[in-house]
């Protein structure tokens, strides 16, 4: 799905989605990479709104269906308007579509995915920020999709090669329903 540019028109940034066949049922996942310019928060807000709209199409009943897992390079720090919009800390576009930040729930430390420990960022303008995320939608049947643990991958070079200029965020999530109410 093409994500909007500053004019609200489809642009080169994308959200790629799939519905995976799992032992627990059909599990929707989305991967994305939002605009990167420091001064384009307004564009990223349009882009996260488009992702919120996509989530609505992937779930028939948010209180019964498996939650949507969303990951990617959001190019925004946790207190930015676009991340606050996703996590319900400011007005959301769609009622019943809020995203829980897995690093915030179970990560350890700062979670910097754009780090000066990465050789590709030796001359970066603004290193040591958390720009990459894994989210799980709310509401959802408790505790489906809750992170058990969250960590960074690709932190160390392998065979002298750094995998990317960003570290990856990885999570183990709960896959069984508890029968409790949706909270």
What are these regions (language model features)?
Residues 36, 47-50, 135, 168-169:
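Hydrophobic side chains within alpha-helical segments
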Residues 17-30, 41-84:
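His/acidic metal-ligating clusters that form di-metal
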Residues 8-18, 45-47, 94-98:
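Phosphate-binding glycine-rich loops and adjacent basic patches that engage nucleotide phosphates
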Residues 1-36:
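Structured beta-strand-rich core segments of catalytic domains in phosphoester-bond hydrolases
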Residues 56-68, 76-183:
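Metal-dependent phosphoester-hydrolase catalytic domains
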Residues 37-40, 111-113:
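A short acidic, helix-capping loop that chelates divalent metal ions and anchors anionic groups
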Residues 33, 73, 166:
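Histidine-centered divalent metal-coordination motifs
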Residues 10-11, 41, 127:
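Short alpha-helical segments used as structural interaction elements across diverse proteins
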């Amino acid at each position: 799905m093409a994500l909007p540019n500053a004019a609200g028109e489809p642009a080169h940034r994308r959200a790629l989605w799939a519905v995976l066949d799992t032992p627990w049922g059909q599990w929707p996942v989305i991967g994305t990479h939002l605009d990167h310019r420091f001064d384009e928060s307004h564009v990223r807000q349009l882009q996260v709104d488009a992702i919120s709209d996509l989530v609505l199409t992937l779930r028939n009943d948010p209180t019964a269906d498996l939650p949507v897992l969303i990951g990617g390079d959001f190019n925004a720090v946790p207190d930015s308007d676009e991340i606050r919009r996703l996590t319900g800390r400011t007005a959301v576009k769609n009622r019943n579509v809020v995203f829980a930040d897995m690093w915030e729930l179970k990560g350890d430390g700062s979670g910097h995915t754009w780090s000066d420990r990465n050789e590709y960022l030796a001359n970066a303008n603004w290193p040591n920020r958390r720009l990459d995320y894994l989210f799980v939608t709310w509401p959802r049947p408790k505790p489906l999709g809750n992170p058990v643990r969250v960590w960074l991958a690709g932190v160390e070079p392998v065979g002298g090669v750094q995998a990317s200029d960003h570290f990856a965020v990885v999570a183990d999530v709960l896959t069984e329903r508890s029968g409790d109410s949706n909270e």
